Design a protein with these regions (language model features):
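N-terminal capping segment at the start of a domain
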Residues: 4-22, 149-152
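Cofactor-binding active-site loop characterized by glycine-rich and histidine/acidic residues
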Residues: 14-138
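Generic beta-sheet signal
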Residues: 47-49, 113-117, 144, 198-208
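Acidic, glycine-rich active-site loops and adjacent beta-strand->loop/helix elements
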Residues: 54-57, 119-126, 150-154, 186-188, ...
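A short, conserved beta-to-alpha structural element at the edge of catalytic cores
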Residues: 86, 139-165, 169
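Conserved thiamine diphosphate
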Residues: 111, 160-193
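A short alpha/beta connector and helix-capping loop motif
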Residues: 126-151, 201-207
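Glycine/aspartate-rich loop-and-adjacent alpha/beta segment that forms the canonical ThDP
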Residues: 172, 186-241
């Protein structure tokens, strides 16, 4: 059962994307609660957030606009620090390396705050993700939190049929010195995580459902990037009341 807050954010994301030519609903809805929990409860002014899975931007834009930012409404976010966006996204596997650089700079300069990076499970197939796991573990960055939206679907189909990667990623991260935890990405598990006492970077595997909240989108690959209109749009908005 989604909260009224979660439903409204999804409705607003549909309206915003429709008005600006957007169509990545599945990945936006799978990470909605992660974004809501982070921005409503976890992030402080000292923290930085990177949406590495840029196609999940429509819920992100909704939340940024609620906070008074005015980001450019494109299909993937681009660097606009004055509007709350600290990394261009779209090409997969780039957010974590950038986040490591930010976290290392903060560590070296004794700056407060953490760096949160939200990634997709499909982009965890990228070599840059694996290289980043190794270097972050070696650098011992306790101020780095990487969250994987593990919805099981990428642009061309189910992850399990293309290159199942998450179990190996978790094992590699632990071997490289990360703290690894699994949560339900659609409830408040993220809020219960103690992120202050770890001396290592933290990898959070958030189990989610692609298209969460709209019955005909849930766990259906075509809704990674499908246009919403007509009766289906009406049904989606009705289900999110």
């Amino acid at each position: 059962m989604l909260s009224s807050r979660s439903k409204q954010v999804r409705r607003d994301a549909i309206a915003l994307s429709k008005a600006n030519g957007g169509y990545h609903y599945g990945g936006s809805f799978s990470c909605a609660e992660i974004l809501i929990n982070l921005w409503d409860h976890k992030l402080t002014e000292s923290d930085r957030f990177i949406l590495s899975k840029g196609h999940g931007c429509w819920v992100y834009y909704v939340i940024l606009r609620e906070l008074g930012f005015n980001p450019t409404l494109e299909g993937h976010p681009h660097y606009e620090p004055e509007e709350g966006i600290f990394c261009t996204a779209g090409s997969m596997g780039h957010g974590l390396p950038v986040g490591i650089g930010m976290a290392l700079a903060r560590k070296l300069n004794n700056q407060e705050g953490k760096v949160f990076v939200l990634m997709g499970d499909g982009e965890c197939q990228e070599g840059t993700t694996w290289e980043s796991l190794l270097i972050a573990g070696q650098l011992k960055l306790p101020n780095l939190v990487a969250i994987v939206d593990n919805n099981g679907i990428q642009g061309s189909g189910f992850v399990k049929d293309i290159l199942p990667v998450i179990p190996a990623l978790m094992s590699a991260a632990e071997s490289a010195g990360w703290r690894v935890v699994e949560i339900d990405g659609h409830n408040s598990d993220l809020l219960d995580l103690d992120l202050d006492s770890s001396s290592r970077p933290t990898l959070v595997i958030a189990q989610t459902i692609k298209g969460k909240g709209v019955s005909f989108m849930e766990n259906v690959p075509k809704w990674h990037s499908n246009w919403l209109a007509g009766d289906l749009e009406t049904q989606a908005l009705e289900e999110l009341k």
